Amino acid sequence: ALNYGFAKPDPRAPWQQPVTAPGPLAVRAELQHIMRYWLERGAAGFRVDMAHSLIKNDPGFRKTNKLWRDIRAMLDREYPDAALVSEWSSPIDAIGAGFHMDFAAQFNAPIFNPLFRAPGDAWGSHGYFNARGDGDALAPLEEYLRHYRATQPRGYISFQSANHDMARMSGGRTLPEIEVAMAFILTMPGVPFIYYGDEIGLRMPD
């Protein structure tokens, strides 16, 4: 595992190095080196898995925010067309930390789960977008608008059709249900993300 440091190290645990220790600083420098390597070869940007979790024992994400703001500053300076996308699932926090956009993903239950999942469904294949009409869009809409108003015009909220952690849109849905859900994802403000295979209606399992 890579050690980006601990915001509040426990002195009883010597492996918990502060973010200013030589090891974590070297890891950050290497991260930027790797990003430059791929950007020089034509990468359009980076999608960061669990972006909020790099620095440990960091209440309020103060040190985590600084890490990403430093990276955003490097991108703005050297690769201004590159996109920095987070799986933070809290657009207010992620965009405040310097990301261009954040997924309204499964971590953020108030937005994602009521729309695309239902309690008790092991595949997570239903939610508001199902023909039974037993979902409720009001609560996720209110939460979405809270994040939208707080982040405009600094960044974007992104809906995704699926990812490696959750079921495909096709799991347990009929074609009309998929069409309505995909139309929502593609027409909401922000930047939509289509999981590979969903563009051709790939069924589960894949």
Language-model regions: role of each:
Residues W38, V48-D49, H164:
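Conserved structural-core and active-site-/substrate-pathway-adjacent residues in large, well-folded domains
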Residues P24-R28, T64, L138, T174-L175:
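A conditional alpha-helix N-cap/helix-loop micro-motif detector
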Residues A1-R41, P59-G60, L67-I71, R77, ...:
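Substrate-binding/active-site clefts of carbohydrate-active enzymes
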Residues H52-I55, D165-A167:
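A short, flexible beta-alpha/helix-coil linker loop
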